[in-house]
Structure formats: C-alpha cells, structure tokens
C-alpha cells in the first residue's frame, strides 16, 4: 500500500475528527485506485467511513471491485457492510447482475447462510431478479427454504 492510501485510511478512522475525515475525502478525490478502501483488514477502525466514502464514488469506478464489495456485504457483522449494501442497491442493475449471479452461484453449496442474508435484497431488485438464471433462482429459493 502506498503512503497516500495509508494516510487516507488513517484519517478515515472512527478515532479521528470530522475535519480529518474531510481531508481524507479531499485526498481520495485524486486517488487513481479505490481498492484500498474495500474492507481494509489492517484498518478495521476505518471500515465504516471507508464504506461511507464509497457512496461518493461513481458506479464505473466501483464496477471492477464488485466481487470484493459483495464479499464485504456477506460479512454482516463487519462495520460498513450494511452501508456497502445500500450503495450497491443504488448501482446500475446492468453492472451488478453478472457479479451478483456469480457470487450467488459460488455459494450454492455453502453451509452458512450469511451470503444469503447479505445479498438477498440486492437479488430481489425488480430489475435484477427477472434477469437471473434459473440456476441462480434455484439457489436463492433453496437458501430461502433453509432460512424458514
């Protein structure tokens, strides 16, 4: 991780003032890559504000990182996961469809249902659900039955 990215993550910590968080957003405006904002394991104290920063990043910049963002949504108890889910709900359905379908199919044989709780609202989107494959519908229905 480069020095500027480390500085941004440190400034986004819940322990820093809002003024410092604003400074982090200013630095972020010039960042070439945003991958360092996505669930940075070494900066747990920054997760919530990293997720909030993602609200200001356009869909096209988020699109290459959708698998990692969906994994964050799956981590239900992690700070920021619900915020990331809200951000993805606002994303263009055409961008979200393929990565979401891949994510769901990867969890077809999972014993844990955390993935389902994390992405079920995304999959239920009226623009996405009808476009999912039969196989993906079956996986979602099977998970829903396990929940009941």
Identify the role of each PLM range.
Residues 11-16, 40-47, 74-79, 106-111, ...:
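Short coil turns that connect the paired helices of HEAT/ARM alpha-solenoid repeats
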Residues 10, 18-30, 48-60, 71, ...:
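Structural detector for internal amphipathic alpha-helices that build alpha-solenoid repeat scaffolds
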């Amino acid at each position: 991780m480069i020095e500027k990215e480390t500085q941004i993550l440190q400034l986004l910590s819940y322990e820093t003032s809002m003024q410092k968080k604003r400074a982090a957003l200013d630095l972020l405006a010039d960042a070439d890559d945003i991958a360092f904002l996505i669930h940075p394991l070494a900066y747990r104290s920054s997760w919530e504000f990293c997720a909030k920063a993602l609200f200001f990043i356009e869909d096209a910049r988020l699109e290459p990182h959708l698998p990692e963002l969906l994994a964050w949504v799956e981590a239900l108890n992690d700070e920021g996961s619900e915020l990331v889910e809200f951000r993805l709900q606002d994303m263009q359905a055409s961008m979200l469809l393929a990565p979401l379908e891949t994510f769901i199919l990867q969890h077809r044989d999972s014993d844990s249902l955390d993935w389902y709780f994390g992405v079920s609202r995304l999959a239920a989107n009226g623009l996405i659900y009808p476009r999912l494959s039969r196989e993906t519908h079956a996986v979602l229905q099977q998970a829903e039955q396990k929940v009941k």
